[in-house]
Amino acid sequence: MLYGMSIAKIVFPLLTLPYLTRVLSVESYGVVSYVKAVMQYMQLVVDFGFMLSGTKDIVNAKNDHKKLEKEVGDILLARILLAAAAFVALLGMIAVIPLLRANIGYTLLAFVTVFLSVFLFDYFFRGIEKMQVITLRFVAMRGIATALTFIFVHSDKDILFVPLLDAVGSLVAVILVFVELKKENIKIHFSSVSTAWKKLKNSFVYFASNMATTAFGALNTLLIGAFLPATEVAYWSVCMQLIGAVQTMY
């Protein structure tokens, strides 16, 4: 199932890339690409390595249902706090980066998808070894967003639909995930902020590892957009996406 998701991660961007570059101007596509790079960092913060540390916690607790519910609640609270911190950081970036400031509506809409990812609980389904849930929700999320993009995005005036449709796809995925949680009879129970803070400290090493290995992919785009026009971001981003797609195959 996870192999299927790996294929989907290649296919969906390759479907939208030629379409968006055709219907959007170079400048608008540069905005799309730059905000996407920013959101990759926001997503790293919100994930904070819980895909690894959270999965480990779920595996250790899966034979104790009450403890399992507590682990889910504690990690959820920690990720909500991370999302709040990421949003504050994003507001700071909007204040100092002209490209984001000029497209504040687009940027804030794009963050909605990052926030909704808090409620996807991939670490839980990995921990209980139900990988098919992760794959199905990903395909549903990206499939809906991709299909709606072809329907609603036809020119620069439709640019706000790009993050909005991503958010719609994510919302559908969240609903599907909560249906699966109900099937597992999981009721989320929050403990305390101090417990959530402990979860963050335990997961920091995984976050640092992820940051070191994956963050640099978007760093060049981030720096280019901070100092150069959106058109330069667009050209750079298209090249990097094509290179990334080829590298994924090997």
Model-derived segments and their meaning:
Residues T21-Y29, A95-I104, I128-V133, V139-V174, ...:
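Membrane-interface helix-loop junctions in multi-pass transport and translocation proteins
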Residues V45, A84, L91-A95, L99-F124, ...:
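Alpha-helical transmembrane segments of multi-pass membrane proteins
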Residues D47-N63, I243-Y250:
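Helix-loop junctions and terminal segments of transmembrane helices
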Residues M1-L14, M141-A145, V162-L181, V193-Y250:
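Transmembrane helical elements of multi-pass membrane transporters/channels
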Residues S33, K66-L81, L200:
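Interfacial transmembrane-helix starts/ends
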Residues L14-P18, L91-G92, D122-Y123, T146-I151, ...:
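Alpha-helical transmembrane segments of multipass membrane proteins
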Residues Y3, G30-S33, L76, T107, ...:
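Hydrophobic/aromatic positions within or immediately flanking transmembrane alpha-helices
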Residues G54, F121-Q132, V153-H154, S170-S192, ...:
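C-terminal transmembrane helix end/exit motif
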